[in-house]
């Protein structure tokens, strides 16, 4: 007689590995006891079994392009489905099921100071970064390397005449110049261009070598990450980076089982360069005023999940150094 589908030695490894019914019942009881005692046992089990694994934050290549600037200035500014400075928040509700709500985080409203300077002026050599170019995909660290690699014909010979020729390029748009200053970056001043990147970079290169002053005038947008606001945010929230695809699966189930509330948000743009879908990260927010969140934060930290508050501290420190 032919054996039934699913029977036989092929199923043996699964049957051997699968916990017996009494073992599952004992673990369920143990989990409930641990949860009542204030320890996130289900989350610990998910991490131990590899269902929830930490992913290291991978910053994008360090370049003079704005694609390397962490955009604290636009982070949590709101989208078509979410208001600015609000979290997608889950908390215990009816029948121990999580309920969804939007919670405002006032500290985010104070995180970045924005200032507009209409009659800004600087020298061309003060510009250290650019926003756009047809060569933006090249990972170039220093603005002086840009014309050497991508437009050598624009910087030879080194002369004031060659400098003047570059400055006449219409893509520079002298009457529409805009700049951005980011307090947490080492390069600080970026030209918010649409065109003319090769010619202005070449002109800057030649101005340095000929000693010629080239004044630039336009509008400056200054963004300052406020250390006091960072500290205030850190006093109220534990924040960790968790694989995005697991937040509303493994992590959600564990937090609902533990009856521990949490918030969810995106990362700041350009903070993390995911290599695959599995490497994509999002943030989970744990309110410090809730009694159960400290044990969750301790477990995530010990397991190696990136502590977002450390990232905030590092960038706030860079602001004070600059």
Residue ranges and their predicted role:
Residues 213-240:
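Charge-dense polyanion-binding interfaces
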Residues 197-212:
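Short active-site loop/helix that positions an aromatic residue
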Residues 169-173, 208-213:
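Secondary-structure boundary elements
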Residues 2-39:
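Non-catalytic protein-protein interaction scaffold segments in large eukaryotic complex-forming proteins
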Residues 29-190:
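Short alpha-helix boundary/capping and kink motifs at helix termini
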Residues 20, 24, 34, 60-63, ...:
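Alpha-helix boundary/N-cap detector
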Residues 193-194:
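Active-site neighborhood of thiol-dependent amide/isopeptide-bond enzymes
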Residues 241-322:
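C-terminal interaction module
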């Amino acid at each position: 007689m032919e054996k039934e589908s699913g029977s036989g030695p092929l199923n043996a490894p699964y049957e051997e590995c699968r916990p017996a019914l009494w073992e599952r019942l004992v673990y369920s009881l143990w989990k409930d006891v641990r949860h009542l005692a204030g320890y996130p046992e289900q989350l610990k089990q998910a991490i131990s079994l590899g269902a929830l694994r930490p992913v290291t934050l991978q910053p994008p290549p360090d370049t003079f392009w704005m694609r390397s600037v962490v955009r604290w200035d636009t982070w949590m500014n709101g989208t078509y489905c979410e208001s600015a400075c609000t979290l997608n928040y889950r908390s215990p509700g009816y029948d121990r099921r999580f309920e969804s709500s939007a919670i405002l985080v006032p500290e985010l409203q104070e995180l970045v100071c924005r200032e507009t300077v209409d009659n800004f002026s600087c020298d061309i050599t003060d510009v250290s970064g650019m926003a756009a170019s047809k060569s933006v995909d090249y990972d170039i660290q220093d603005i002086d390397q840009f014309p050497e690699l991508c437009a050598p014909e624009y910087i030879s010979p080194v002369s004031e005449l060659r400098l003047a020729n570059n400055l006449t390029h219409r893509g520079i748009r002298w009457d529409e110049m805009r700049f951005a200053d980011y307090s947490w970056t080492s390069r600080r001043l970026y030209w918010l261009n649409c065109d003319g990147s090769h010619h202005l970079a070449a002109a800057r290169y030649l101005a340095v070598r000929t000693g010629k002053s080239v004044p630039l005038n336009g509008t400056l947008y200054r963004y300052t990450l406020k250390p006091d606001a960072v500290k205030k945010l850190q006093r109220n929230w534990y924040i960790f980076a968790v694989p995005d695809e697991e937040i509303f699966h493994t992590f959600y189930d564990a937090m609902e089982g533990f009856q521990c509330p949490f918030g969810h948000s995106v990362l700041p743009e350009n903070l993390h360069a995911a290599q695959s879908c599995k490497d994509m990260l999002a943030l989970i927010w744990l309110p410090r005023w809730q009694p159960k969140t400290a044990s969750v934060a301790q477990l995530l930290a010990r397991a190696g999940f990136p502590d977002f508050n450390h990232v905030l501290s590092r960038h706030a420190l860079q602001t004070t150094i600059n």
